[in-house]
Every structure is written in structure tokens, then in C-alpha cells.
Design a protein with these regions (language model features):
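Short, conserved catalytic/metal-binding motifs centered on acidic residues
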Residues: 55, 68-70, 88, 92, ...
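Conserved nucleotidyltransferase catalytic core and NTase-mimicking acidic/glycine-rich helix/loop elements
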Residues: 352-384
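An anionic, glycine-rich sequence signature occurring as long contiguous blocks
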Residues: 222-323, 412-436
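Flexible loop/turn segments at secondary-structure boundaries
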Residues: 76, 134-136, 179-180, 211-215, ...
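Short, solvent-exposed helix-loop connector elements
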Residues: 39-43, 300-308, 324-339, 356-367
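Dynamic "connector" segments at or just before major functional cores
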Residues: 1-150, 160-178, 186-198, 222-223, ...
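Short acidic (Asp/Glu) and glycine-rich catalytic loops that position anionic groups and cofactors
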Residues: 2, 34-35, 71-75, 199, ...
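Domain-level cores of phosphate- or acyl-group-handling catalytic modules
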Residues: 179-240
Length: 436
């Protein structure tokens, strides 16, 4: 492999996937290589970590489909992975199949802990949400229906936990379609607790009505450091109950909005108590509309309902913007393979987030597909070697002055951050950039 990589560098490369090399400094800052060596159980000289790096870069490029039907080679892609070739589907499939869900989960936890110490998570609000991707598998499986009028269909569910303040994913879990949202949420919160290491009462978990279950509330209250806030189903019995609350028990907050809170006992759960937050909208009694939320702890209901809970929708925004990284397709039903592939996409998202943050506007506002097409696979350039340094030159880079500020003289920038500028998967070469 090393001989092939050195030969490619000696021959020089021209292509339009040179933008992918902008991620390499972020891999060094993130410690991606050590994570991949640990996950693959192989030393850096072996091919396994490099195949995993190919998966990460495929995710960053939002590349999907059979590898033999793509044209990723001879454009600078394989060299960014430390390989003289683009690995085929069989090699990638074999790599993922060798590693279990537990190993990929440990990789997620290690990545999350690095991101936490780097300040990517505020750790105050955690939004959890299930995403069910339609599956066209011929396997027999439980079907899902989100609308009583629609026909049930096969799904491959993914459950995300997102920091609602920084809009960054903390972790995810997957399951078969038979898994309940409650059981999946318990697994997800156990994973998030290990990543965030939050003191008791610091983190509020925001969930949708699908997670209103005694089992989940019991688990959160007894076995996690988190608090939980979930809306109650807006059914007739609840509306009747809320309308029976005397008006003087509500506190008017501003025109058309009043709140109250009270202890709440679940009939099938002896511990507790929980707390019901009630909001009333409308000025006239005949126009009043009521809504209720259930919380595991007593807290300021106004902030919880008006400031905290609306941030749960950031998880929907995140998924819409970044699902093209590899979370919008069901693929195989082999959970080892799916979990591994989607975890590599999580690493890709972490590197992309850091790159966006460094570049600023307009790049920071682009979704994953736009960023991949316009920057990672949209910059023309060449790759050559000068002494012990790989020099990447861009000829059409937008905002070249801004990019030059962050990327030219990269080895010195990294050393100033106390990061070794030698790239282990590129056999100890350093990396520098030029903008023409």
C-alpha cells in the first residue's frame, strides 16, 4: 500500500475531489485515526482503518449506491484515505460484518466524549427523536403506520439524540422495526449519559408524545442523571380534565397565555411524583385551548414550555440537513453492517461540522449535499509532494483569502495547537495547502 501511495504522489494528481482534503486537518484535531484503529482492532500499517476512512469520506461526499458504478478513483479520493485504490463493496461489507453493534457503540461513545471535551455539546438540552426510513426488504418484519389512513409499511428505524443548543448529534441507535420507541429511548439515553457525564438535574431530555410511557419515565427518574419532558396526548379525557381546573390556579404570563403546574401520579407507577405542566392559550373563556406536558422534576414551567421544548424541533432540522450523509436509506438489515456504516457517517458529520465552523458563512449554512457537491467535490486542484509535505493546490476556490488564512502553513498551525502535523495514514507526510 505504501509503495502505491508514494507512486501516486510521485506521479501527481489532478482532479475535482481535492476539496475532500480540507477534512484531513479536522481528522487530526478530532483523533479520527486512533478511533478507527481501535474500532478495527488493527494497527495503523494494516488496511482496515483505511477502509473505514474511505467509508467516512464516502459519507462526507453523500455518495450512495454500488461502488463499481461510481467514478471516485483517479480524482484524489483514494489517496485521501491512504490507499492506492478505491475498495469495492465486498471489502467494505466484510470489514463492517466483522464488527459488532457493541463495538460501533463504543466507537460512538469515544467520539462523543472527544466532542464533549472540545465544546461541541452544551449538555443542557437533549432532544431525542425516532426516524423511520422506508425499507423495501423482502424479509418478514413488523410494519409501521404513522397515519391511520395510510397503509402500514416496512421501516428501518434510527433513534437520534441531539444537543438542542449546539444542534450537534450526541449519539444514535438503530433497531429492527419490532423495537418499541420506549426501549430504544432507554438504550439511547444510557449511551448519552456515558458521553455527556452530566451531573444530576443538569440535562433536560425533550421527547415527543410517542415517548409518553411509564417504563421510560421510571427509567429516567431512577437510573439516569437526566430530567424528562414529554407532551401528553391531546385526547378528550385530558381536555375535560384540564378545563375543570379552576381559573384562579392559572398564572397569567402575558396576553393569551397562562400556565400552572401540579404533581401528577401515573396509575401504574408507585414511585414519583411527576409534575404536570399545563398551558392555557386564548383570552376569552370560550376560546381557551389547553395543552399539558409531563415532567420528571419540578422546574420553571414557563421556561420549559416556551424556551426549552420548542428547541426539540432542531432534531428534525438536523436530520433534514444531514440525512444525505447516510442516514436516509435503509440498506441491509444486518445490524452490524448498518450500525458500522452509520457510525462512520457520524464521524464524517463531526469533521464536517468543524470544517464548516472554521470556514464560516456561507459554508456553515449549507446542508450536507450542497457542501459535498459545491466544496468537497467541486474544487479543482492538484496534489504533489515537496520534501516531506504533501502540497494541495486549489485553482478555483471561492473566498480564497479566507481559506488561505486557515489552511496555508497548516503544519505550523497544528504545532501551535500541540497537534502532530504528520498524517499517520499517509505514512508520516505533512499536509499543506496553496490557493492560486
Amino acid at each position: 500500500m505504501e509503495r502505491g501511495v508514494r507512486q501516486l504522489l510521485a506521479d501527481k494528481i489532478s482532479g475535482n475531489m481535492i476539496g475532500l482534503w480540507l477534512l484531513i486537518p479536522e481528522h487530526l484535531r478530532l483523533g479520527t485515526w486512533d478511533l478507527l484503529c481501535g474500532w478495527s482492532r488493527q494497527p495503523g500499517e494494516r488496511v482496515g482503518p483505511r477502509l473505514a476512512l474511505q467509508l467516512i469520506h464516502e459519507s462526507a461526499l453523500c455518495s450512495a449506491g454500488l461502488r463499481n458504478q461510481r467514478s471516485l478513483s483517479q480524482r484524489g479520493f483514494e489517496l485521501a484515505n491512504g490507499l492506492p485504490f478505491v475498495a469495492n463493496d465486498v471489502a467494505i461489507h466484510s470489514l463492517l460484518a466483522e464488527h459488532t453493534v457493541a463495538e460501533s457503540r463504543r466507537l460512538q461513545i469515544a467520539l462523543g466524549q472527544i466532542r464533549r471535551t472540545s465544546g461541541d455539546f452544551a449538555g443542557k438540552l437533549l432532544a431525542i427523536d425516532p426516524h423511520r426510513t422506508r425499507s423495501y426488504s423482502k424479509r418478514q418484519m413488523r410494519r409501521y403506520r404513522d397515519d391511520q389512513k395510510a397503509r402500514p409499511y416496512k421501516v428501518a428505524p434510527t433513534f437520534f439524540a441531539l444537543d438542542a443548543d449546539t444542534h450537534q448529534p450526541v449519539c444514535f441507535t438503530i433497531a429492527t422495526s419490532a423495537q418499541t420507541a420506549t426501549r430504544a429511548a432507554i438504550d439511547l439515553l444510557e449511551q448519552a449519559a456515558e458521553i455527556l457525564a452530566s451531573p444530576a438535574g443538569k440535562t433536560l431530555v425533550l421527547a415527543d408524545v410517542e415517548h409518553l410511557a411509564v417504563e421510560l419515565f421510571s427509567h429516567v427518574q431512577l437510573h439516569t442523571p437526566f430530567d424528562l419532558l414529554v407532551p401528553m396526548r391531546n385526547e378528550r379525557w385530558l381536555q375535560k380534565q384540564l378545563r375543570a381546573i379552576p381559573s384562579e390556579q392559572f398564572t397569567r404570563r402575558w396576553a393569551g397565555f397562562a400556565t400552572m403546574k401540579r404533581p401528577y401520579k401515573m396509575t401504574s407507577y408507585a414511585a414519583g411524583p411527576f409534575f404536570q405542566f399545563v398551558q392555557r392559550t386564548g383570552e376569552r373563556p370560550d376560546a381557551h385551548y389547553f395543552g399539558a406536558f409531563l415532567s420528571t422534576t419540578d422546574r420553571d414551567e414557563v421556561n420549559a414550555l416556551t424556551l426549552d421544548y420548542p428547541k426539540r424541533w432542531h432534531v428534525e432540522e438536523f436530520f433534514n440537513a444531514h440525512q444525505a450523509l447516510g442516514w436516509n436509506r435503509a440498506g441491509t438489515m444486518n445490524l452490524n453492517i448498518r450500525y458500522g456504516q452509520m457510525t462512520m457517517a457520524l464521524i464524517a458529520q463531526a469533521a464536517l461540522h468543524r470544517t464548516r465552523r472554521l470556514l464560516g458563512e456561507p459554508y456553515s449554512g449549507w446542508d450536507a449535499d450542497h457542501f459535498a457537491k459545491s466544496l468537497l467535490a467541486g474544487l479543482e486542484g492538484d496534489i504533489r509532494v515537496h520534501d516531506d509535505t504533501i502540497v494541495v493546490t486549489y485553482y478555483n476556490a471561492p473566498n480564497a483569502d479566507h481559506l488561505r488564512q486557515h489552511y496555508e502553513g497548516l503544519p505550523d498551525h497544528l504545532q501551535n495547537e500541540h497537534i502532530d502535523p504528520h498524517i499517520p495514514w499517509l505514512y508520516g507526510f505533512k499536509l499543506d495547502f496553496r490557493f492560486r
